[in-house]
Design a protein with these regions (language model features):
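Catalytic cores of large soluble enzymes that bind and process phosphate-bearing ligands
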Residues: 14, 45, 71, 141, ...
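Short, surface-exposed acidic
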Residues: 30-36, 62-66, 114
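C-terminal cap/substrate-recognition subdomain and adjoining C-terminal extension
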Residues: 1, 74-92, 99-166
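Short, contiguous strand/loop micro-motifs
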Residues: 22, 69-70, 139-140
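Short hydrophobic segments within beta-strands
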Residues: 6-8, 96, 166
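Metal-dependent phosphoesterase signature
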Residues: 47-81, 89-91
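Active-site neighborhood of HAD-like aspartate-dependent phosphohydrolases
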Residues: 1-55
């Protein structure tokens, strides 16, 4: 039996939602705000809304986006201690985030290995940012989550495992 912690990132490990902060700083408000409202009032799925939000951002701004978030990201008090406790107890700890690899992984690099992070992938190869969804909803979820935490949990879970979701 393995005990696994699956922990959210934006607004849980960090004190703010990084996607919202990024969009408020770089996306045109007249295009971003309706998408944000749609996601919050659930008229748009997270996958659809967040995908459309990132499509507002020119790909050539990647360095500026990352610098902005690295400057502002604050890791919540107690996170490091939670990781230390998990390691001492032999608890498998993973981040399952609706955030994007280009900022989630560098922010967490001092704490976790990349293999412990499940998130979406930002593609900067075109004129605007495109999001790939490697952890999208499986056949048991139709919510359009983007990074579907329950799907990741089902993928990782083995018989007898205990899953703790934060």
């Amino acid at each position: 039996m393995t005990v696994r912690i699956l922990c959210d990132f934006d607004g849980t490990v960090t004190t703010q939602d990084n996607i919202i902060a990024l969009m408020q700083a770089f996306a045109p408000a007249d295009a971003f705000e309706p998408l944000k409202r749609g996601v919050l009032d659930r008229t748009l799925s997270i996958q659809s809304g967040v995908g459309q939000m990132f499509a507002l951002l020119p790909s050539d701004g990647k360095t500026a986006y990352l610098d902005f978030l690295l400057e502002r990201a604050i890791i919540r008090d107690g996170f490091s201690e939670l990781l230390q406790y998990s390691r001492r107890q032999g608890i498998d700890f993973s981040i399952v985030s609706g955030g994007m690899d280009f900022f989630v992984e560098p922010i967490l690099a001092p704490f976790l290995e990349q293999e412990q992070i499940y998130c979406n992938v930002a593609d900067f190869s075109g004129p605007f940012v495109h999001i790939d969804w490697p952890n999208a909803c499986d056949a048991h979820c139709t919510n359009g989550c983007g990074c579907c935490k329950t799907s990741v949990a089902r993928t990782l879970r083995k018989d007898g495992d205990i899953i703790i979701v934060i």
